[in-house]
From Swiss-Prot:
Disulfide bonds join C96-C107. The keyword DNA-binding applies. Self-assembles to form a helical, filamentous nucleocapsid. Together with capsid protein 2, wraps arounds the DNA and maintains it in an A-form. Capsid proteins probably maintain the DNA in A-form by non-specific desolvation and specific coordination of the DNA phosphate groups by positively charged residues. This certainly protects the viral DNA under conditions such as the extreme desiccation of its host. One of its GO terms (molecular function) is DNA binding. This is Major capsid protein 2. Heterodimer composed of major capsid protein 1 and major capsid protein 2. It is found in: Virion. It comes from the Viruses. Its main location: virion. Keywords: Disulfide bond, DNA-binding, Virion. The keyword Aminoacyl-tRNA synthetase does not apply. GO terms for cellular component: virion component.
Length: 145
């Protein structure tokens, strides 16, 4: 597939197409991925964040990964929805805090690193004016776990 086809797939299909394109780029199957350098960086950081969570299994870890993926999907749209992305990021941090050995700062570092955003943006959503909404989202995350 050409780079242009992958670009169109990402615009339509979001994260799964980006994942596929990034993997093909890493294998050398496509040469130019300048349009998705943001994705390449995001996936690299996401992989680092998952490693930071260790080999812990279970629902909270799966929820952290799912919420980070959700936030990345919101951020990757042609018109990114940062409000929904940050809400998903807050839920990821709250789920991460439930994991053994993890605290808020480590979770903020992992999630912010995976998303390529400043952890203060997520912290502000958790504690600032958007904190009430973030708290509600955290409760919803608790119900899923």
């Amino acid at each position: 597939m050409s780079v242009e086809v992958y670009r169109q797939k990402i615009e339509k299909g979001g994260y799964s197409a980006a994942y596929e394109a990034t993997r093909r780029y890493e294998r050398g199957e496509i040469e130019v991925l300048s349009w998705s350098s943001r994705w390449e960086s995001a996936w690299s950081k996401f992989g680092e964040a998952v490693k930071a969570l260790g080999k812990i299994e279970g629902a909270p870890r799966a929820l952290v990964i799912a919420k980070v993926q959700e936030a990345l999907a919101y951020m990757s749209k042609p018109l990114p929805n940062m409000k929904l992305a940050m809400a998903a990021a807050v839920q990821a941090v709250r789920a991460c805090e439930q994991l053994p050995g993890m605290n808020r700062e480590r979770c903020l570092d992992a999630v912010a690193g995976a998303l390529g955003v400043a952890k203060d943006w997520i912290r502000r959503e958790m504690t600032g004016g958007g904190g009430g909404g973030g708290g509600g989202g955290g409760g919803g995350g608790g119900a899923v776990v």
